[in-house]
Curated annotation (Swiss-Prot):
May play a role in DNA repair. It seems to be involved in an RecBC-independent recombinational process of DNA repair. It may act with RecF and RecO. The lineage of its organism: Bacteria, Pseudomonadati, Pseudomonadota, Gammaproteobacteria, Enterobacterales. Residues 81-176 form the Toprim domain. Keywords: DNA damage, DNA recombination, DNA repair, Metal-binding, Zinc, Zinc-finger. PROSITE patterns: RECR, TOPRIM. The keyword Glycosyltransferase does not apply. SMART domains: TOPRIM (SM00493). This is Recombination protein RecR. Gene3D superfamilies: 3.40.1360.10, 6.10.250.240, RecR Domain 1 (1.10.8.420). It comes from Erwinia tasmaniensis (strain DSM 17950 / CFBP 7177 / CIP 109463 / NCPPB 4357 / Et1/99). The gene is recR. It holds the Pfam family RecR_C.
Length: 201
């Protein structure tokens, strides 16, 4: 029997996080209350501010406190002519970590899934179409996940790009660096063979 209704509420609230079950939530709650109350207060303040102040960029739909995010507002990226389409803001972070992309993004916040009632309008493709029509975009890089839904979404966007005379490309899928061939699944291996590249001498 729980001695504190507030503690019960705290543990239940922590369970909204991905991968956090009852035991993990209990450990987190006790850690904050027993050993790090100041950290708990900072966490509470940061969560409160983030939930109330962070919205979506008017151009790319990623998370930001501003109307336009810093990436979209960067003049060098604006004139680059490249847009990379991703499924979530976390994908932007992953791509930015590579340092290999200097264009702008468009975040779908999901993917097409007719069985779940998710259509083009639900993932902002009307906004992307506006950008294709009004901006000087040279190429759209489709970086949706290599799932059935991700591939369907990429194909749909590629057809939109074709309508507006904009080049569309798909990120490569293949064997991970450092991976062993025998451990790679058949689908990935098929993509690797189909997307093989010649040596350049």
């Amino acid at each position: 029997m729980q001695t504190s209704p507030l503690l019960e509420t705290l543990m239940e609230s922590l369970r909204c996080l991905p991968g956090v079950g009852p035991k993990s939530a209990q450990r987190m709650a006790f850690q904050l209350l027993q050993r790090d109350r100041s950290g708990g207060m900072r966490l509470a303040q940061a969560l409160t501010r983030a939930m109330s102040e962070i919205g979506h960029c008017a151009d790319c739909r990623t998370f930001t406190e501003q109307e336009i995010c810093t990436i979209c507002a960067n003049p060098r990226r604006q004139h680059n002519g490249l847009i990379c389409v991703v499924e979530s803001p976390a994908d932007i972070h992953a791509i930015e970590q590579t340092g290999q992309f200097s264009g702008r993004y468009f975040v779908l916040m999901g993917h097409l899934s007719p069985l779940d009632g998710i259509g083009p309008g639900d993932i902002g493709l009307d906004r992307l179409e506006q950008r294709l029509e009004t901006e000087s975009i040279q190429e759209v890089i489709l970086a949706t996940n290599p799932t059935v839904e991700g591939e369907a979404t990429a194909n749909y966007i590629a057809s939109l790009c074709e309508q507006y005379g904009v080049d569309a490309s798909r990120i490569a899928h293949g064997v991970p660096v450092g991976g062993e061939l025998e451990m790679v699944d058949g689908t990935t291996l098929s993509h690797s063979l189909a997307g093989r590249q010649k040596f350049k001498f």
